[in-house]
UniProtKB/Swiss-Prot annotation:
GO cellular component annotations of the record: host cell nucleus; host cell PML body
Source organism (scientific name): Epstein-Barr virus (strain B95-8) (HHV-4)
Keywords (A to Z) from UniProt: Activator, Host nucleus, Host-virus interaction, Phosphoprotein, Transcription, Transcription regulation
Identification of the protein by name: Epstein-Barr nuclear antigen leader protein
Molecular function GO terms recorded: transcription coactivator activity
Family listed: Belongs to the lymphocryptovirus EBNA-LP family.
PTM characteristics: Phosphorylated by the cellular protein kinase cdc2.
Top-level division of the source organism's lineage: Viruses
Keyword Transcription regulation tagged: yes
UniProt-annotated location(s): Host nucleus
Amino acid sequence: MGDRSEGPGPTRPGPPGIGPEGPLGQLLRRHRSPSPTRGGQEPRRVRRRVLVQQEEEVVSGSPSGPRGDRSEGPGPTRPGPPGIGPEGPLGQLLRRHRSPSPTRGGQEPRRVRRRVLVQQEEEVVSGSPSGPRGDRSEGPGPTRPGPPGIGPEGPLGQLLRRHRSPSPTRGGQEPRRVRRRVLVQQEEEVVSGSPSGPRGDRSEGPGPTRPGPPGIGPEGPLGQLLRRHRSPSPTRGGQEPRRVRRRVLVQQEEEVVSGSPSGPRGDRSEGPGPTRPGPPGIGPEGPLGQLLRRHRSPSPTRGGQEPRRVRRRVLVQQEEEVVSGSPSGPRGDRSEGPGPTRPGPPGIGPEGPLGQLLRRHRSPSPTRGGQEPRRVRRRVLVQQEEEVVSGSPSGPRGDRSEGPGPTRPGPPGIGPEGPLGQLLRRHRSPSPTRGGQEPRRVRRRVLVQQEEEVVSGSPSGPLRPRPRPPARSLREWLLRIRDHFEPPTVTTQRQSVYIEEEEDED
């Protein structure tokens, strides 16, 4: 056995047809000098995936001091990264120290989940008959001459050549597919009895103390919709147990399929080297900074007239569930105040197209008066999806940013001029999807659902049962006992409004 183990090297040189020195040997050789993706003349498929995920969960009773003191500290102590942190582009969305919020003040137990996901996937499939082969193939040429039939120099060699000079993702006219995905998600759940002070005190502070960002905050387009300090709401006053879920999802996906018919390769390969030396974390400057920058000039998705497909999706969802007996006063007193105190936004608020559906102060409603146990679920879903398929045959970016303002005013309810306009505005100047004559498809969906379930025997007001005389017989007494233990009446009301808008522009 020892003789057999020593001999395979010299005693089995391999046949001329299939062995390492035969026609297939040169094809299957794996020790190509420069790199498996850059050296030799072999076809390649390269996939790169970068995934950054941050998840945070807070379970707290927040026994803190005054709200003003809490809002002053977090600024300097949590500066955040330049890409996504509180001071970056997504900071206003994920800012965590809003003082008068029902989840921040008092001692209410809360559970907050925040998730930030940044993912990039790149796939390159190329043959790229680029530049002079001699420079790159000097080493492999004489050392791997190969047979004339199948090897690298034979009929299949030209097919499998891989010597693309600059980089698999940046040089030549290599067909490539690049996907970038940015996902920011925030979910907040509150379970509370809200043992707070008078309603007036709570509603006075939020104005100046929460100016909010221009995009999504309380003073922005979604502020009126997601405002949490409406005084007469059944979930704000008293000590009613409630469960509130809010979810904000911002997602962007970009796909590029291109051959990059741009200028000389040398010019393109010279710039990216020194200007993009490689990230310490993920992006060239910060952990996520350069990855999320959309207007890099030499990027394969920005230069030339490369066909590309960009999808952006913004989803805002709020779900509220109230389980309460509402031991409140007369109905008339509750319905008088909300009218002037909650004017609402023109688009989605109580005075807009969805206001009648979301009005919560209807006096004769079975869920407002008396002490009836009830469960109310409200769900508001605002979604916009934008898809751009373009070759970007436009002029300078500065000229591109001037036109979209007046030419795309948007609808009064949801468009750029309505309550969601600041969030969904599409004419940011340096963005590749904003200017020129790019064909695009825009879908907007607004879904408002309200479900109300009432379990009532309501011993209140005029619904209180009349006193009955004592039973005169055993049979009558048994019938009354059966009626008493029968399941109560359950009334369920569902209302839904769905608005969908689709726009195609060439």
